[in-house]
Amino acid sequence: MNGFWQPSCSLDALSARAELLRTLREFFAAREVLEVQTATLASHTVTDINIESLRVQDSSFLQTSPEYQLKRLLAAGAPSIYQLGPVFRAGEAGRLHNPEFTLLEWYRLGFDDVMLMAEVAELVDLVLGPQPVRLLPYRELVGTLTGDRDVLDLACADALARLGPGRFFVTEYPAQQAALARLNSANPEVAARFELVIDGVEIANGYHELGDAAELRRRFQDDCAERVSTGHFCPELDERFLAAMEAGLPDCAGVALGVDRLLMLKMGASSLAEVMPFPVGVA
């Protein structure tokens, strides 16, 4: 048991993390994007079938993302905003997963998904050094836009793992995988959604945000129906969030980026445990 109390990562990794957080904040300060803090413990959570939340005393949830609360701030008149801090997801542990991790999420007023991809690429170039990013439509990656969602998810994950070195924006996700993104106005078969993959690691997920409250409610209800049919817990819909969307979400694009994974790539590490002091096994 000797040394069982020791942190998982090196002191160099702690210094690199501090430097990265400083770099991220300077990036947004230079663009006059406001840093905000929202609640990590809230009364509601996401319905996404692929995400499991951590419940606290059966009545509250540790947040899987600040998305709903950030969008409520935007509906209340906030300018372009970002949040940098911890989020939580149940059942996620491994080389690239931890139940608690650091997420950078930001929203840019007046941006669409294409404009936001350019800004994401700027940030990544700043952190990792300049390198071209290839645009890769989902149909080109997977070979189809139609079929069972679970089958498509597996095919996509397998294709991403085989991409190899390099930076890729996967774009034009099928409409059934739109999540909270708008559908593409020129081609409603696909969503205005993108994911950034670097050296086979998924780093960021972004949308041209959907603000239609009725459509969002329908998507949430579809999620819940799928959850019930597969034996998963179905949370109550977040009516405060939906009321904010009814009041009006300004035209914007948003993206969530995994800071720990970005740091892992920057340091040439092979797992999150090398860049987190206390991952789940030693926390």
Language-model regions, residue ranges each:
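Hydrophobic face of alpha-helices
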Residues: 21, 25, 117-124, 217, ...
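A conserved active-site cap/scaffold subdomain adjacent to cofactor or substrate pockets
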Residues: 96-147
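A translation/RNA-centric and nucleic-acid-associated enzymatic feature enriched
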Residues: 4, 23, 39-73, 82-109, ...
